[in-house]
Amino acid sequence: MISWNYASASLLCYFWFKPDLSHVSISNTPWWLIIALGVLLPSVFLFLAKSLQYAGIVKTEIAQRLSVILSLLAAYFIFQEQFNQLKIVGVVLGLAAVMCILFTNASGGGEGQKQAVWYLALVWFGYALIDVLLKYTTGLGVQFSVALSLMFICAFLLSVGYVAVTTKNIGLTKNVVAGLCLGVLNFANIALYVKAHLLLKDSPAVVFAGMNIMVVLLGVFSGLLFFKEKLKLATAIGLVLGITSVACLAYAMSV
């Protein structure tokens, strides 16, 4: 299912953004980045699925959205972005939120809880790494639509190849259909996010904060209402710290 998700995402990316693939070349295209992201994209999807299985939707959504903390640290240490006091407070609160979420699972000591901690950490780190590599790609002069198309195509080919080698088939019909539908949602998420940045190009903090805060809240409420998950004290504290962290960072970027 994950493999075929990137097939439909590739097609939609081509027809939506209409990338000019004539400029793609062996020497001028950052293939190492394309391949790295082609491996990371489906891998993080697998980590996400395992995290949902062992840790639940509430903690997984929070960990995923708080990956922005690592991205901001990379912005400071790698991309030399200047940090004010509010940004530093936001980073510290975000790290504290992640620790609360991870130690909610670590406290029990069971095998499933240990796996939950590992997969939450992989989701947190994986999404941040993808974000950093995407930012690095856009700074190399490659059209974002071209890079995105190549990433989706690479992710599809590598994941299909992996499935074909390990399972000797490329999926049941229902999994292929489900994957194609998932690709529509996956692409829509990226396309609408880019569109929002284009429409609000002078207010990126509004788009950034709106996406992260609302997704975390919707993820938490979905877990509580539909999946009947219990909200432990440490998770609740992590949620509050996470929302406060993103709010601080958004305000810091807008002043």
Model-derived features with residue positions:
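Polytopic alpha-helical membrane proteins, predominantly small-molecule transporters/carriers
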Residues: 1-255
